[in-house]
Amino acid sequence: MEITELFSKIYGEGRPLIILHGLFGMSDNWATHAKIFTQHGWQVHAVDQRNHGRSPHTTGHNYDEMSSDLERYIRRHNLNNVVLMGHSMGGKTVMNFVVRLPSLVDAMIIVDIAPKAYPVHHQAYINAMKSIDFTKDNSRKAIEAKLSKQLNNPGIIQFFMKSLYWKSREELAWRFNLSALEINIDEIGAALDYGYYNGPSLFISGGKSGYILTEDHDSIYEHFPQAGIVTIPEAGHWVHAEAKDSFSAEVLDFLETL
């Protein structure tokens, strides 16, 4: 299914920096960093990918489709000299995009994801969210309590809670399309198994994450010969949230070279 228009929040004026969130995330997750980057001459487009946030829901959810969504967004907004940044699933979208359409991109930043395949490891989260019956669990407090009984991770629970909204006056709902994401979970973990991008590239990994290992570096350089790889030791997978200042500094240092 073709997406007609992705939702985005646009901050500031200047050269375009497009940010793509990760699985179960949305553009709001990047508001703090967007405001920081606008202070350095960048117009930040924080985009909701398909099946997330305020963007349309669809049954399809793979990286070719999400890359095509991004292409339409760039062309519709008449953006030039674009820098792309993506976290986790968003990083896979960016990698797919730049090997297919390198002429539309000046540089890319990938946050805590490698081009390799990742085994399915989100099922506990999916099961916990599927257990919510919005016809009965009709308050944020009740939903948080139910999730807390199944997930021993307050940070993850609060991350999910940000995607709750009032579908009607009486009923809450997830902004993401949980059923489509579960059906396509293998696609979300798929490897980038073709192509290369020879433009400026930065990979930022969390030292406590385990998503980018030393043995992944060869694959990164194979697809992205100009890549720089930096590790923020104190951060886990949500590098931008767990080490905000260090992360912003690494990104800004890279952007200043462009």
Where are these regions (language model features)?
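The conserved beta1-alpha1 loop
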Residues: 20-22, 205
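Active-site glycine-rich loops that stabilize anionic/oxyanionic intermediates
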Residues: 14, 22-25, 88
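Active-site loop/oxyanion-hole signature of alpha/beta-hydrolase fold enzymes
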Residues: 31-34, 39, 43-85, 89, ...
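Conserved serine/cysteine hydrolase catalytic core
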Residues: 169-223, 228-231
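Catalytic histidine-centered segment of alpha/beta-hydrolase-like enzymes
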Residues: 235-248
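Flexible "cap/lid" loop of the alpha/beta hydrolase fold
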Residues: 96-99, 106-137
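Alpha/beta-hydrolase fold catalytic core
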Residues: 1-18, 39-42, 79-80, 224-225, ...
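Conserved alpha/beta-hydrolase catalytic His-Asp/Glu region
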Residues: 120, 135-191
